[in-house]
Structures are given as structure tokens and as C-alpha cells.
Amino acid sequence: MCRKKNIGTHSTYAQNWQTFTQLIMKTAYIVRAYRTAVGKAPRGLFRFKRPDELAAETVAHLMDSIPELDKKRIDDVIVGNAMPEAEQGLNMARLISLMGLETDTVPGVTVNRYCASGLETIAMATAKIQSGMAECIIAGGSESMSYIPFGGYKPVPDYELVKNGKEDYYWGMGLTAEAVAKEYNISREDQDAFSYDSHQKALAALKSDAFKDQIVSIHIEETYLEGNTKKTRNYVVDTDEGPRADTAIDKLAKLRPVFSAGGSVTAGNASQTSDGAAMVLVMSEDMVKELGVTPIARMVSYAAAGVPPRIMGIGPVAAIPKALKQAGMKQEDIELIELNEAFASQSLAVIRTLGLNSDIINVNGGAIALGHPLGCTGAKLSVQLFDEMKKRNNKYGMVTMCVGTGQGAAGIFERL
């Protein structure tokens, strides 16, 4: 029998293997990134726009921005979606590929990690390109909460789990936000103040056209009845619908809790239900050089982590350290953060627990003001991050969020 040569301790072997893989892994670059505006659900500006159409138009715009790329060279379209059923079912990513690229040669796959789905797709695209399994991938997310409500149309819990004390596996997100507020001592006043700030930052961003270069204009044709007459109107959506100029602390304080009697979580300090799509183009270094395109960013690391489902909102507390460790970075190295504001309570709990710098978090407002289109959010926040990092000349930024059923996710990006 041939004996294997002693190559040292497990630790030494692991270090050698890591060095080896780093040497052979390819570099993946993000070369384009766009999003739609975010519409309110269920009665907002995108209420008659299917999520596959919304994403397909975003893909088409992305392709128009890079005429050097032959669409038949795209290896895959990976789309995040949190509720993949009905209009979001039937492997929506493949339909988006067919409609947006107008070719049947590019496959598509739909991915679901709830609120982190859009970020997950960027990580998947990056990993596939780094490993040599692909050269060019469109990644992103699309969600219509106007068409498919949170939880879908027919959720079916495992009642055996519920009977055995695991009912928190199926808790609504609002209940988990209440649990976080209680466990982490987040007051109603602090939640409302956080929400007010989110709206003020978002309103300032809209006033200064901060999102202008990110947003794809979406044309809507709406058919309606006026009396017995069928009419059609056309309009363009190019501005986020969520921020409210009439938001005030005293108005927020008057809102009643909606998830728990005597609770502190209200419609005013929770994220909005929303519709939207966002797409990025990820490409190998070889293809970037061949086409002569300029990359805008690269994903340095990505991590997902598990936490107790009943306090799912603290997910980033577990995910952020993992992502930093992967990248060999410290918290202080991050210059800009997009933290998804699922709820003010969980956002504050994350910020305080990790000691994050509030001055660099959600500088243009967050989901409480701008909306949270579930499976789209991770990609949307990434698009916003890249654009704002460029304006501020930042080197490293991070996108992070909590995830339903007790998870967190974080992605670190380098601006190029």
C-alpha cells in the first residue's frame, strides 16, 4: 500500500490549501448595477406590473448599457425571490432571462433566502465565476408584494413542530420585532426617532437626485374603467414612492402597535411592503479585459448565519463578524453600510450590539422610508451601496440584513 506523505498538521494543511485555492481562483468583477424605483404595495405605482416584467425591463436596460457584450455569452441569470409562487413561480428567473435578453440560450435559476435572496445571488455569481464554472452572470432580485403578499397565499406550517413548542419557527416578522425590542430594551421612542430619521434622509436623497444614476425608468400602461368606458393611461416610474414628507415624531407616536397588544412596533417604525427589481452584471477578469469594460466593484466576502427564529432581527449580529473574518478585515475598515431596516427595533439592536457607526449607515434612508421588496432588497441595497461609495470615494462597504426564520446575511464589497 502506498502511504501518503506527511504534509504537516491539519492547521498547516488548511493554510496551504487556502493559499493554493487563492492562487487558482479567478477574480469576479461587478461591471454594471441598476435597480427600479421601489413602489408601495399593494396599491402603489407598480400594482399592475408583474415582477417578471419589472425585472426583465431592468435586465434589458443593463444590457443596453454594455453593447460590447454578446448576450449569448451570458452563462446564467440568477434571481432572488422570497415568495416564488403564482406570478413569481414557474422559475421566474428563466422567464426574466427569456423576456429581458430575448434569446432562449441563457438559462435562469430562482433563489430563495427570503430577505437576503438578492444578495445571495451576487455571492453565487461571484463564487461560480471565481471557481471557473462561469464567465458572465446576471444576478439580482425581483419581488412584487402587490401580487404576492408576505407568506404567500397558502402557507402550511408543520403543526407537529408547533405542538412541540416550536411555534416561533412560524412567527410573523412583527412578533419577532417585538421580541427583539423587549430583549434588547429598544424603547418605542427610540424606534420612532430612528424611523423619522430614515424618512428625513430619504427625502433629502430624493431632493438631491441621489438615486438618479441607479434607477431604470419603467413605463406603465394602466387600463381602467371610468363609468362604462374603458380607458388607458401611461406613465413612467423613476422615483421611489415610499418616503413621506409629512412624517413627524408626534404622528409616529400616535400610531398603535399592530403586532402585539401593548407592544412598540407600529406601521410607522416597520419597513414598507414594496415592489421592485435590481440587477447586477458579474464578469470574470478575463472577460473584463477582453471587452475593455471598467469594473465598479467586487464582492470580497459573503456570510450567512443562523440565530434563534424568535429574534430573527439580530441576524446581522452573527453574520457581520463572519463576513469580516472571511475578508480578514475589522469593523473599522468598513466605510459605508446598507443595513436593511426591516424594523427599527432590530436595526437599533444590531447597531448597538455591534457598536456600529450610525453616521455611515443608510446615509440615504432605509427600508422604513424607501421600502423592502423582500427578495429584491439585497441586490437593491448593493446597487445603492456601489453608487454612494463612488460619490464618497469609499473603498469598502457592506450590505447586511436579517432574514426570516432566524438568519442573517452580510456581504462586503470593494469599490474599484
Predicted regions: what they are:
Residues 24-51, 248-314, 325, 383-384, ...:
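Condensing-enzyme catalytic core mediating Claisen C-C bond formation in acyl metabolism
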Residues 49, 81-135, 168-175, 246-272, ...:
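Conserved catalytic cysteine-centered active-site region
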